[in-house]
Amino acid sequence: MRPILIAGNWKMHKTQAEAREFLRELGLALRSSPSGSASQRQIILCVPFTDLAVVAEQSRGSDIAVGAQNLHWEDQGAFTGEISGPMLAELGVRYVIVGHSERRQYFGETDETVNRRLAAAQRHGLTPILCVGESQQQREQGLTESWIVGQLDRALQGIDLENLVIAYEPIWAIGTGQTCAAQEANRVIGLIRQHLGNAQLPILYGGSVKAGNIDELMAQPEIDGVLVGGASLDPQEFARIVNFQALAPA
């Protein structure tokens, strides 16, 4: 059975003091939940570099795993502003987002550099969360499948599928309030899994995930969890997402 992962991506939000307060409030919200379902799900918080040590310390012994939002493919060197796999591993980081659409859009990330970052993460015992997805224009042109397959083929050369998470994040649904229909997300994630030889690795959905749509998303058989953006900044909202109750298929 594939694991269920609920990953929050804080992006460039929260000081250390705010991170401590978030974890305090999240802990209270999860403990007061009547469902008790949180213990059956892996919670991941992918936080800014400055928050990693605080979150790792505060979440020790809990169900929360710490994730980073990027890493360099080299272990050390003259790469101003970057961070390496050994640095993250030393802090207790277990997961790292690679190839997020914002990294591709704003910082020139390519499938080739994504491939190198994936290899670096796995080399140091980190589990990468590879993000793939299509733009609005590609969607309208009917290129969703071919675009995502191309991203996968280029990024996954030489990568171990046994230590990998994939997140399908349609770019047009990120931070826009538009959510990909649950059935459509399930279809695309099924296509990804089929392209990878029905690999049993976790595949998540990301794109305007919130408490109001999590139950329907998690009722889909191919969706193994979610990568949550803005809704992960509110501890009460994030707790409701963690404690989803999957709806019965219509």
Swiss-Prot record:
InterPro entries reported in the protein's UniProt record: Aldolase_TIM, TIM_sf, TrioseP_Isoase_bac/euk, Triosephosphate_isomerase, Triosephosphate_isomerase_AS
Pathway given in the UniProt record: Carbohydrate biosynthesis; gluconeogenesis; Carbohydrate degradation; glycolysis; D-glyceraldehyde 3-phosphate from glycerone phosphate: step 1/1
GO terms (BP aspect): gluconeogenesis; glyceraldehyde-3-phosphate biosynthetic process; glycerol catabolic process; glycolytic process
Keywords: Cytoplasm, Gluconeogenesis, Glycolysis, Isomerase
Catalytic activity: D-glyceraldehyde 3-phosphate = dihydroxyacetone phosphate
Pfam families from the UniProt entry: TIM
Positions bound to substrate: 9-11, 175, 208, 229-230
EC number of the protein: 5.3.1.1
GO molecular function, one term: triose-phosphate isomerase activity
PROSITE patterns named in the record: TIM_1, TIM_2
Active site (catalytic residues): 100, 169
Entries under SUPFAM superfamilies matching the protein: Triosephosphate isomerase (TIM)
Gene Ontology CC, one term: cytosol
Places the protein is found: Cytoplasm
Complex and partners: Homodimer.
Role according to the record: Involved in the gluconeogenesis. Catalyzes stereospecifically the conversion of dihydroxyacetone phosphate (DHAP) to D-glyceraldehyde-3-phosphate (G3P).
HAMAP family: TIM_B
Membership in a protein family: Belongs to the triosephosphate isomerase family.
Official protein name in the record: Triosephosphate isomerase
Gene name tied to this protein: tpiA
